[in-house]
């Protein structure tokens, strides 16, 4: 098995950034996805350049923080910030969605990073109103997309003609995670050639504590992802840790 361990929310804050880099340098995280509209963006870019073995993709955002582009009223509230949740996306103006996603990709590329793949915050890329736009952008940038697990079956995925992993898990998430939680996820997907596991390691800082409902759990993830027991399991099972750059 080839395993991509992706850390979401790179760029959210300095605490998140430092936790992700620690999970890569001392643990099993191979990949991260960058939020270009958040306060820790520039800090994350610097860390990414210092750690070239960390694959970095983009974490497209339509539900957190503020937009990168101008004049996207169908996506924002009265204060100019993205609306919470996803209910508004079905009625959002497609041209505004595409304009914003293109602006985020443009900021990523302008930072001088190599784009490895595309995923999204709160899985909005799998939303029926968003997925066609994301697939068009992925084709333009010639990069893989996180398996759109909300979209349905393997057959449906194959019909989309996208480059992605055969397996994806969002189950490494919650209040009661252990090393065995991670191991069970890997074992459940043992028949897939290439698998991605989504993670959220971080150190706590004010931005996380005040802005995210998923806070202290991130430190638990960091502890697990750097645990000697987990690294030994991956070694013993001859699992190859890779990034999205190895797809194709």
Swiss-Prot record:
Keywords: Carbohydrate metabolism, Hydrolase, Magnesium, Metal-binding. Mg(2+) binds at residues 59, 121. It comes from the Bacteria. Pfam families: YdjC. InterPro entries: COD_ChbG_bac, Glyco_hydro/deAcase_b/a-brl, YdjC-like. Belongs to the YdjC deacetylase family. This is Carbohydrate deacetylase.
């Amino acid at each position: 098995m080839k395993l991509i361990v992706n850390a979401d929310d790179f760029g959210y804050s300095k605490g998140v950034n430092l936790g992700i880099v620690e999970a890569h340098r001392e643990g099993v995280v191979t990949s991260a996805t960058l939020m270009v509209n958040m306060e820790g963006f520039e800090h994350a870019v610097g860390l990414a350049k210092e750690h070239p073995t960390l694959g970095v993709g983009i974490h497209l955002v339509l539900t957190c923080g503020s937009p990168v582009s101008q004049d996207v009223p169908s996506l924002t509230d009265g204060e100019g910030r993205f609306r919470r949740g996803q209910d508004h996306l079905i009625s959002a103006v497609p041209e505004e969605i595409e304009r914003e996603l293109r602006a985020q990709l443009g900021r990523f590329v302008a930072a001088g990073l190599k784009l490895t793949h595309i995923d999204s915050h709160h899985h909005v890329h799998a939303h029926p109103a968003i997925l066609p736009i994301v697939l068009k952008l992925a084709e333009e940038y010639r990069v893989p997309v996180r398996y759109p697990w909300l979209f349905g079956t393997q057959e449906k995925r194959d019909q989309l003609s996208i480059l992605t992993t055969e397996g994806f898990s969002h189950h490494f998430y919650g209040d009661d995670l252990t090393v065995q939680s991670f191991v069970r996820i890997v074992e459940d997907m043992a028949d897939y050639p290439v698998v991605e596991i989504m993670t959220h390691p971080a150190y706590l800082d004010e931005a996380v504590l005040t802005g995210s409902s998923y806070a202290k759990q991130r430190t638990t993830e960091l502890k697990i992802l750097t645990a000697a027991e987990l690294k030994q399991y991956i070694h013993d099972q001859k699992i190859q840790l890779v990034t999205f750059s190895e797809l194709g």
